[in-house]
Amino acid sequence: MTRLQKVLAGAGLGSRRTIEDWIRAGRITVNGRTAQLGDRAEPGDDVRIDGKPVALPDMASGERQLLIYNKPLDEVTTRSDPQGRRTVFESLPQARTGRWISIGRLDVNTSGLLLFTTDGELAHRLMHPSGEVEREYKVMVRGQPPAEALTRLRNGVMLEDGPARFDSIEPVALQPGADATFKVILREGRNREVRRMWSAVGHEVTRLSRTRYGPVELPADLPMGQWRLIPIAVLDSVGLKTAARAI
């Protein structure tokens, strides 16, 4: 059997440190008994967090999967939606073991690259801010931003949840009288961050698509709404040096 915090981290419920805090707080039970640090669990055990049952992945199989998905507009990155909108999980195949965990999210009006894995610890590490994993987007904004606005975005703008900056801004299409298109890179994934940054310099985002997450690029031949399995090894070392302390 595997230690409880490792099993629950593998299910994508949080880092091992977070789950250890939950155990100390008495929030987790195993087969009706309040869990203690050092407890172990396996598939078939009745594990609950705050009274809610948790599906345990088969850690013994050692089989991890990674999938790339080209998200269309109007799909939500949640397992269910109270408004009845289609979710990205409806388009994914059945995972061989465990369940698919999204590595970050895209809002309903953003398209492009989404990564999914059955390795909860990997997902947590790649999403944690300390990992500083690059996200690349193609963004179209209304109007032609002046050089001053681009400088502000590179140096940093203040949002309601703190400062934010682009590591890189490269023009893709700049035509007088038309919306401008840029390729931008940043190293965090706060809610609607790219849109809010452009709004802070007075330009509305009219189209937004993610084209890269870490070393994984959106394949040019992957149609929107389609998925593809890729080797998980391409992400195993990403974010390890800076994010290890967060796990």
Q: Which residues does each PLM region occupy?
A:
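Basic, flexible Lys/Arg- and Gly-enriched helix-loop patches that mediate nucleic-acid binding at interfaces
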Residues: 1-247
